[in-house]
């Protein structure tokens, strides 16, 4: 070794130089991994957001029709005396009613029994003219005329019955979102007083898709 060459310089010259293009390849791999992760998150988000009426709280339901989605609202009936009735009109969010001409194909009611449930209830959904009230006499007549399906849900020895949903088809009626304020959920407490903390009703309104703003996941 030449005395003029320092030991440090000699060690530096023996260091392995990086191959040409390795830095750019590494950067590309990192970018690809980041893009893959973003796509996985996006796919997961889209999978969650796909419309379906398959809820875990009821049995035998179906997916939404092509081009349709659904909006859910929750109703909690008040205390209902034995042999008495309760009714409440459907009230969808403003973000949905802004598209009042979008067609509605089906209404689905799901009964979610709470731990204290030990009663028998009849549940239905009916079109009620805006001029009509929801008095006990009016609701009683609607349950008896046979013009809409009625779900009879009751406490059983095993706890609660498996079938806890009612599907009301509006396809032939050409109903739209604007018509939903004319529909009401009706409840009849048959055998005893229904307490406030016995059931919750989930109402799924299946309607044509409406424009919504979505953001990519971060």
Swiss-Prot record:
Gene3D superfamilies with a match to the protein in the record: Cucumovirus coat protein, subunit A
GO cellular component, one term: ribonucleoprotein complex
Biased composition (Basic residues): 12-22
SUPFAM superfamilies in the cross-refs: Positive stranded ssRNA viruses
InterPro entries: Cucumovirus_coat, Cucumovirus_coat_Asu_sf
Subcellular location: Virion
Annotated region (Disordered), positions in chain: 1-30
Source taxon at top rank: Viruses
Pfam families recorded: Cucumo_coat
Sites bearing N-acetylmethionine, chain numbering: 1
Molecular function per GO: RNA binding; structural molecule activity
Keywords: Acetylation, Capsid protein, Ribonucleoprotein, RNA-binding, T=3 icosahedral capsid protein, Viral nucleoprotein, Virion
Domain observations: The N-terminal arginine-rich stretch does not seem to be the major RNA-binding region that allows formation of an infectious ribonucleoprotein complex.
Similarity section: Belongs to the cucumovirus capsid protein family.
Function: Capsid protein. Probably binds RNA and plays a role in packaging.
Name of the molecule in the record: Capsid protein
Organism whose genome encodes this protein: Cucumber mosaic virus (strain S) (CMV)
């Amino acid at each position: 070794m030449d005395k003029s060459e320092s030991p440090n310089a000699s060690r530096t010259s023996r260091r392995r130089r990086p191959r040409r293009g390795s830095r750019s390849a590494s950067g590309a791999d990192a970018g690809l991994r980041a893009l893959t992760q973003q796509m996985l998150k996006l796919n997961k988000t889209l999978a969650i957001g796909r419309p379906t009426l398959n809820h875990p709280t009821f049995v035998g339901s179906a997916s939404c029709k092509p081009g349709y989605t659904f909006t859910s609202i929750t109703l909690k009936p008040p205390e209902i005396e034995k042999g008495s009735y309760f009714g409440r009109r459907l009230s969808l969010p403003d973000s949905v009613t802004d598209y009042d001409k979008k067609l509605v194909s089906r209404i689905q009611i799901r009964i979610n029994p709470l731990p204290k449930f030990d009663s028998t209830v009849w549940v239905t959904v009916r079109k009620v003219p805006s001029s009509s009230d929801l008095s006990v006499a009016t609701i009683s007549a609607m349950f008896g005329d046979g013009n809409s399906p009625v779900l009879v849900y009751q406490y059983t020895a095993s706890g609660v019955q498996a079938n806890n949903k009612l599907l009301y088809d509006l396809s032939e009626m050409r109903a739209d979102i604007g018509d939903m304020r004319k529909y009401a959920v009706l409840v009849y407490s048959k055998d005893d007083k229904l307490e406030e903390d016995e059931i919750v009703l989930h109402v799924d309104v299946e309607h044509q898709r409406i424009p919504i703003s979505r953001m990519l996941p971060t």
